[in-house]
Amino acid sequence: SAYPTARLEEIFEDNIFSKTSEITGVAGGELALSREFVYPIATYEETKWDASGALINAFSMVKNHEGMGLQLMFRPTDPIWTKVSSERTQNLKGGNKKSGSSGIAIVDIAKGLVRAPFEPPEAADKSKKQEKVLTADEQTKIQAIDEKAKYPGFEVLIRVVASSDSEARSEALIGGVVSAFSQFNSTSLNGFKYEMLKDKEKIARDFIFRLFPQNKNKNILNSVELASIYHLPNRGAIPTSQVERQTVKQVDGPVKIPKDG
């Protein structure tokens, strides 16, 4: 609905693996969250620029005999992730601190019973009302965690694979993509880290078959974060020379067409 003139077409699968290069020239890995998933990455609402331009620049470095692919796969996650976010904010506020020993807790209760007859009611009420004073950084984190939990969450797998004459060249191509993803890094919150995989045959197989393991619930992004990573290229933000665009548009036919006459 955000792109009413967009048209989807089914195409043949692109083969990014060079026919002349061997498996030794393949490199790849995954981009995972650098911190716990409750912390959000930097989105378009904060950066105010289109991050897809840097990704397109990274892919423009690929030569004719080389190949590189970026897979972004996601699926709805269990709504329980919002409870984890709520628990994290409570911990930051200091509301869920538990004693490390039941014996210490019993001693504290006994001390309270002994002091109670000699302690003025005002002093007791004052001690109960004492709350943790949050720092500016803690307030920012609490607000960011709550804001992320407002939107639907998705388990995400981001895989990048490159094929060239040598592994060093493939890693250099991947380095451009990793650098482009640094735009989503937030100093005090979250970002992405690149995890290189050593099994080259497994990298190629997982990429071809789009393998999405079940244990990827540590990488959870909401709909705003996903839209920041991938969206249809904006004509105003992305130069026309970098993206192949349609020269014609398909329009719907008239509703009432005469059947005779």
Predicted regions, residues:
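Extended, folded cores of ATP/NTP-driven motor/assembly subunits in large transport
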Residues: 1-259
